[in-house]
Swiss-Prot record:
GO terms for cellular component: cytosol. GO terms for molecular function: ATP binding; GMP synthase activity. Coiled coil: none annotated. Catalyzes the synthesis of GMP from XMP. The keyword Nucleotide-binding applies. Pfam families: GATase, GMP_synt_C, NAD_synthase. It comes from the Bacteria. This is GMP synthase [glutamine-hydrolyzing]. It catalyses: XMP + L-glutamine + ATP + H2O = GMP + L-glutamate + AMP + diphosphate + 2 H(+). PROSITE patterns: GATASE_TYPE_1 (PS51273), GMPS_ATP_PPASE (PS51553). ATP binds at S233, G234, G235, V236, D237, S238, S239.
């Protein structure tokens, strides 16, 4: 079993980033709800847990009814790192004082490190004229610790937060008011690596080659000689899941690829070629375009479209799965963020922005056991796994594509005509991004953007082509840059590139005479339009 770190989640929007940073240090980490009981914590320690991290929260640590850290966390003898709310809870439960701050801090701050602690010693972004080491960090808090618990010493401070970090090194307890997990905290990654390796004693035994060997053995043991079916979408997650399961059990796996008529240009052909010709995976290809388009006729509401597409996918998949009499397992490309979000939804601590298109309702309907070989991995780890399994890099590293496909990139009602126009416009945009290089970085603009796509707007505008007047549709281009997809900035594509894309779309896609570029960031906008 791998050495691991337990992360207790108190509702922060960036808790997943803590786990990702820990794994980037080569250490396995798991996120669990912050209200687990003492028995759970003790059991984790008995299984070799090396340390605990307490996340931030939107809640107030001193308000009645706020979530408390399990008492066992502080008496099982493993190092603990509290972040933001985690620091306040640690202080309050160990005898310190937490108060509401008259000066709330949200955003960039400069923190002065105090004393010499294992966590911060030698880390600095710049030094003041007086010789004080300073850290550039990201703050997001309204409460603050105003009195240290017994045994703790001051570790960091800001002008408005005299206690921005504290430590009881004899017990391995550390806490910071800022967020080391976000990229805005320049030394944050180094801090978390130092905590898990130098303080918790983890050796960094989490790596992809070992994961593949363990996952293959686990799948073989779990499945035995049974047949497995998998809904293959062509997306990264289901593709990597298929490759991993096929590595483990070969022809015991059958993939069902449902074409709902809302895929990108030639996507169906590419999926079939990759898996059948190059990897020898058994695939049942179902063209259900007419069924999906028929159900979407007259439907304009985006949430209604998502639900219809999800429901019809289940129906088509169920019909095909029923023909595979020997199948006892349903495989899904569930990844770790899906697991975390599902847990949050069940506890009522998560807010639903958009419904997710998946096959989550299938196990009960089909009476199949569930196989989720990627449920421990984040997206970047899934991509790394895909490359290690031999999937083409252009498939593994391509931009995310929503389950409902072009159905949520066509605003309003979905029509076959609209899908054809959008497919061709989108293909031109992506082709030009792949061909255009940024001289400064040497990377293509496709590599420099995290997600890029075209959106069909069901409105017409007047134009002129040759000597004639046109009255045709509008397409919007969307390209964003992001580290985590929780926030995103619109990509500053070069004007000549945008001009070339626009010219090609208008000249090559008859029916479109205007192209616009979306310069909205997330928030307030979401990345997808629907």
């Amino acid at each position: 079993m791998h050495q691991r770190i337990l992360i207790l989640d108190y509702g922060s929007q960036v808790t997943q980033l803590i786990a990702r940073r820990v794994r980037e240090a080569g250490v396995y980490s798991e996120i669990h709800a912050g209200d687990v009981d003492d028995a759970f914590v003790r059991d984790q320690v008995a299984q070799g847990l090396k340390g605990i991290i307490l996340s931030g929260s939107h809640a107030s640590a001193y308000e009645e009814g706020s979530m408390r850290v399990p008492a066992a966390v502080f008496d099982v003898g493993v190092p603990v790192l509290g972040i933001c709310y985690g620091m306040q809870s640690m202080a309050q439960q160990l005898g310190g004082t937490v108060s509401f701050s008259d000066h709330r801090e949200f955003g960039y701050a400069e923190v002065r490190a105090h004393g010499h602690t294992k966590l911060l010693d030698g880390l600095a972004d710049f030094t003041t004229d007086e010789g004080h080491g300073m850290l550039k960090v990201w703050m997001s808090h309204g409460d603050k610790v105003t009195e240290l618990p017994p045994g703790f010493k001051l570790m960091a401070s800001t002008a408005s937060c005299p206690i921005a970090g504290m430590a009881d090194e004899s017990r391995g307890f550390y806490a910071v008011q800022f967020h080391p997990e976000v990229t805005h905290t320049v030394q944050g990654k180094a801090m978390l690596a130092r905590f898990v390796k130098d303080i918790c004693g983890c050796e960094g035994d989490w790596n992809m080659p070992d994961y593949i060997s363990e996952a293959v053995a686990r799948i073989r043991e779990q499945v035995g000689s049974d047949e497995v079916i998998l809904g293959l979408s062509g997306g990264v997650d289901s593709s990597v899941a298929a490759a991993l399961i096929h590595r483990a059990i070969g022809d015991q796996l059958t993939c069902v690829f449902v074409d709902h008529g809302l895929l990108r240009l030639d996507e169906g052909k590419q999926v079939m070629q990759t898996f059948t010709e190059n990897m020898g995976v058994k695939i049942v290809h179902v063209d259900a375009t007419s069924q999906f388009m028929g159900k979407l006729t007259g439907v304009a509401d985006p949430e209604a479209k998502r639900k219809i597409i999800g429901r019809e996918f289940v129906e088509v998949f169920q019909d095909e799965a029923g023909k595979l009499q020997g199948a006892k397992w349903l495989a899904q490309g569930t990844i770790y963020p899906d697991v975390i979000e599902s847990a949050g939804a069940k506890t009522g601590k998560a807010t639903s922005i958009k419904s997710h298109h998946n096959v989550g309702g299938l196990p009960d309907t089909l009476n199949l056991q569930l196989l989720e070989p990627l449920r421990e991995l984040f997206k970047d780890e899934v991509r790394e796994l895909g490359v290690a399994l031999g999937l083409p890099p252009q498939m593994v590293y391509r931009h995310p594509f929503p389950g409902p496909g072009l159905g949520v990139r066509i605003l309003g009602e979905v029509k076959h005509e609209y899908a054809e126009l959008l497919r061709r416009a989108d293909a031109i945009f992506i082709e030009e991004l792949r061909n255009a290089k940024d001289p400064a970085s040497g990377l293509t603009w496709y590599e420099l953007t995290s997600q890029a796509f075209a959106v069909f707007l069901p409105v017409k505008s007047v134009g002129v082509m040759g000597d004639g007047r046109t009255y045709e549709y509008v397409v919007a281009l969307r390209a964003v840059q992001t580290f985590d997809f929780m926030t995103a900035d619109w990509a500053p594509l070069p004007h000549p590139l945008l001009a070339r894309v626009s010219s090609r779309i208008i000249n090559e896609v008859r029916g479109i005479n205007r192209v616009v570029y979306d310069v909205s960031s997330k928030p307030p906008a979401t990345i997808e339009w629907e």
